[in-house]
Amino acid sequence: MQAKAVLRHTPTSPRKMRIVAGLIRGKQVDQAKAILMNSTKAASRNVMQTLKSAVANYSQKNPDTRAGDNDLFIKEIFVDEGPTIKRMLPAPMGRAYRIRKRSNHLTIIVDTVNPVS
């Protein structure tokens, strides 16, 4: 049985978030938490929050199973592009430059390493 957690409208560019997501893709949850704790990327805090939420969703969805962090692994993790906010920056000679403030949606799906019966 798998569980999912989604973090929407994160004010980070999808490119930066995908770097962190690639670090933990396919890893066990305890290994992924260790990697995220030692990561210097700012996006790792958001990924850690969502990962903890996915694990909590799994335990809520399956109250009869006792799956710890070493029993779960990250089955899927992907980052989609969110809405882009456009701003104008004054430029020389009466012009204006467009600034695009990007956002993203993060989805994490966790599952058990060995199916528990």
Swiss-Prot record:
Q: Which GO terms describe its cellular component?
A: cytosolic large ribosomal subunit
Say which domain of life the source belongs to.
Answer: Bacteria
Q: Which UniProt keywords apply?
A: Ribonucleoprotein, Ribosomal protein, RNA-binding, rRNA-binding
Q: CDD domains of this UniProt entry?
A: Ribosomal_L22
Span of the signal peptide: none
What role is this protein assigned?
This protein binds specifically to 23S rRNA; its binding is stimulated by other ribosomal proteins, e.g. L4, L17, and L20. It is important during the early stages of 50S assembly. It makes multiple contacts with different domains of the 23S rRNA in the assembled 50S subunit and ribosome.
Q: Which NCBIfam families match?
A: rplV_bact
- Name this protein carries in UniProt: Large ribosomal subunit protein uL22
Gene label: rplV
